[in-house]
Amino acid sequence: MKYAKKWISIDDQVDLLTRGKGLGCNNVDDLKRSLETIGYYRLSAYWFPYKTSSGDGKTVFREGTTFDEIMRTYEFDRRLRLLMFEAVARIEVFLRSRLAYFAAKEDGAFGYPDSARTKLSREYSAAKKSEQYIKHFANTYGDEHDLPPYWMIVECATMGTLELLFSKVSPSTRTAVASDLGVKVPVFKNWLSVLRVTRNACCHHSRVWNREWGVCPKIPNAWSWSGVANGRTFAVLSVIYHLLARIGDAAEPWRGELESLFEDFRDIGLDKVGVPSGWRDMTPWSRSE
């Protein structure tokens, strides 16, 4: 099928939304500014749940839907995404540290799995162009070593490479890292994929509200979840909170910010994030695991 939609001006976009589709708007200048700075297509993901079919088969906004309501949804998503990214960054730094520590202890400073060396070499080569500590190592020790030691290479490795490295190191190293984080190896291996996808979504400003995640977190049996979808953002938030609680004292302040966000935007509704009623009494939020 040929794509038929064509470019239209900002003024025409405003007219289409308000007159054509029935969006309530008290300030056209604000609507124009949002269309200019955020974009019609990006915003359409936030107004989609507010639309319905008209009698002639066209999609229009449900009666009473306002531009302010849609922008509150957008702002909720933006702030939730920032909270998630902050937490994933902490977890990623912890993972770099512990993976390097246990792998080097088990196999030596340069004991990389053969199946990971090609990818590590590519990232090492890229890092030599911009990272001073990598340049120093290459200039000083490059005649003897084609890669830097574990504790150095993990600092320039992508999340995808860390995920690969975890899957290839010795079983005892995988167990040590996963045990530090309070889960079994198969669960943490899945969670690494979840963290990578979440990190990428946050970095690229992708929507976390009303999202079905392509990689769904495995829920530990000990959590005893029943009837709760693990493909929604609530499941990802639960994984993040569990991991934060294992690595330091950031979990409760982060949770406080999350609960404040939920309260400030309670008119948005938490169903699109997958938050069930009574979630505070569920593991890991009850902290009873």
Where are these regions (language model features)?
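Extended intrinsically disordered or low-complexity regions, especially N/C-terminal cytosolic tails and loops
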Residues: M1-T198, W209-E289
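Acidic/aromatic/glycine-rich contiguous surface patches that form carbohydrate-binding/processing clefts
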Residues: H205
